[in-house]
């Protein structure tokens, strides 16, 4: 557990480490008076100019940050996975986007998997929050990537949610690492998921399907 203060805002971060698990979870709690939470809206691509000078590469947008990693190198392959609920309205419940990290851009999703293209080793960010389109105090994106810098954004709380008399939880964040094989990133994520809840094989080791259909409404 780590505590620190930013002016009148108190921050508590609780880290969870599990045996034989390549991931560390972090839960963040806030208390106090605050007017410094980062606010940011995604820059419209039409407002961006051609890069002709060094200054043109600087994008000074701020955002509320859950976690951030900075690495050397410019060869990072990224998968960003976004989930959807509300199956009455959404038929495609998983969307995966693959990209090479370049200039600063924003991405939506709960899971960011990053692989270094030379060593082939990688890491993941898991944002423990609802689907992007139903998150609280949502700023339009969940991750930022710029070359070897990767950030998890969006606390799930606004200034009015934070009070001096109690700890207010923000969304959780998990950092995990994995090896060069394609299956390694799946094993690393699943290993963490098996730590946070009791696994009952007869209940959990199965695939279920929604068979409601129209719930026989047409036959009435």
Residue map of PLM features:
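Carbohydrate-recognition beta-sandwich/jelly-roll modules
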Residues: 1-220
